[in-house]
Amino acid sequence: MASSRLASALVPVWLVAAASLLAACSGESSSDASEESTGPGSSTIVATTTILGSVAGDIVACADPAATVTTLMPVGADPHDFAPSSQQVAQIVQADLVIANGLGLEAGLDDALDNARSDGATVLEIAELVDPIPFGEHADDHSDDHADEAATEDDHADEAATEDEHEHGSEDPHVWFDMTRMATAAELIGAQLATTGGTAYAECGTEVAERIRAAEAEVRATLESVPADRRILVTDHDALGYLADAYGYEIAGTVIPSGTTLAEPSSADLAELVSVIVTEDVPAIFANSAEPSTLAEAVAAETGRDVQVVSLYVGSLGEPGSGAEDYLSMMATDANLIATALTR
């Protein structure tokens, strides 16, 4: 988890208020109408997130244009707080294959995924299969500068971190921010679909993986165009660790010092973040398009600097016309937003 410098004074209270196993391990308000994009033979395929639905949908469309994938979450849903409708729970339990992210990302689906496993469905949890990294692997290490000033706050932060690990796991579930890992995910999905649908699915998994790798080269060029000394990220929650790992960025701090949007920052956390932004001369806070940016905007204002709040597509694709309608365009759009904000 991103570690930062502690400020000597607390932020005002108003700021807070503004606040490799392919096992047969089966797995804001939801919309009753799931998006469809029927699968191999008569199999029923369900993907949890819009990102997985995009990748799986491309594979299925390549192998059998008449087949579909049902995506549970609507565009704009935050996977961390998504709660399924009764109809969606039934879709999960009745599915032959559920493609989930795992590692605690879709906490609201845990019971339904467990029931699906019990009923004989295969639940393919992608994140644990693509070499996940621990939270905070690319956090800023310079926070030691102020460690002695805030021992009490550090104790509280340790307690919060422990609670977060219990809820969310110690491994980061946001694997889609490394496109090479998602290329591997496409191959895994294709291989799993091929077990019931034939070799065309494996071949199409490979084809989609190659498309992802080709697109990753462009994303890499965009992100690497940012000078090394400007590759400093402040985000709404700890979601960009894989991007930082893949492209040489540093996570200097997070508005919510957690791997989930469900946590809440303390006044000390926010004071710490304001200090980091000022000290590092960070020009932008990257928010989540699926969540209100009020707290990030309050932090930006408290710095007294010209700090932009830039909304990224973090856990969901964008609406039609957003430039983030599928996984590849989402990553390209996010890369451009990051590069533009950090080089202005």
What residue ranges belong to the model's regions?
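Extracytoplasmic metal-acquisition and chelation regions
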Residues: 2-15, 21-344
